[in-house]
């Protein structure tokens, strides 16, 4: 059976592993998931990620990041644009997550960008997710 929304599956796996205080989470790899993991790493929400070759396909392993007392670095993560209802934002109307404390991940013509990077470049696009 094919997966309808691989990004939502990735975010759900991250959310579940984070709330269960797992050290890492494993999922099927795709280029889009790799770019989302790049953004999460650059913004400081995850410790690291790597791609492993499996017999059937590639696998993405994300190492979660926790504070000194095992407090979570990801307080919340939400999928915004879904296959049934796409959500787009113009460059003049980019979303702010928690007044700028969180990050919005956008798919633009310049690749995947955060809301701040998209505002700097002056591009809009599809709002994939909010992370805070």
Curated annotation (Swiss-Prot):
InterPro entries, alphabetized: Ribosomal_uS8, Ribosomal_uS8_CS, Ribosomal_uS8_sf
GO molecular function, one term: rRNA binding
Coiled-coil portions: none
Any single biological process term in GO: translation
Record-linked PROSITE patterns: RIBOSOMAL_S8
Claim: Electron transport is one of the keywords in the record: no
GO cellular component: ribonucleoprotein complex; ribosome
Matching Pfam families: Ribosomal_S8 (PF00410)
Family assignment from sequence similarity: Belongs to the universal ribosomal protein uS8 family.
Record text on subunit structure and interactions: Part of the 30S ribosomal subunit. Contacts proteins S5 and S12.
Descriptive protein name: Small ribosomal subunit protein uS8
Gene that produces this protein: rpsH
């Amino acid at each position: 059976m094919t997966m309808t929304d691989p990004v939502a599956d990735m975010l759900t796996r991250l959310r579940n592993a984070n709330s269960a205080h797992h050290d890492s989470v494993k999922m099927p790899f795709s280029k889009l998931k790799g770019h989302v993991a790049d953004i999460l790493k650059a913004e400081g929400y995850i410790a690291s990620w790597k791609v492993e070759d499996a017999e059937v396909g590639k696998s993405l392993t994300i190492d979660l990041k926790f504070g000194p007392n095992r407090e979570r670095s990801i307080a919340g993560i939400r999928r915004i644009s879904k296959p049934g209802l796409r959500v787009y934002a113009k460059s003049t109307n980019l979303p702010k997550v928690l007044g700028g404390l969180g990050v919005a991940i956008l798919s633009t013509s310049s690749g995947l960008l955060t809301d701040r990077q998209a505002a700097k470049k002056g591009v809009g696009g599809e709002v994939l997710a909010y992370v805070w």
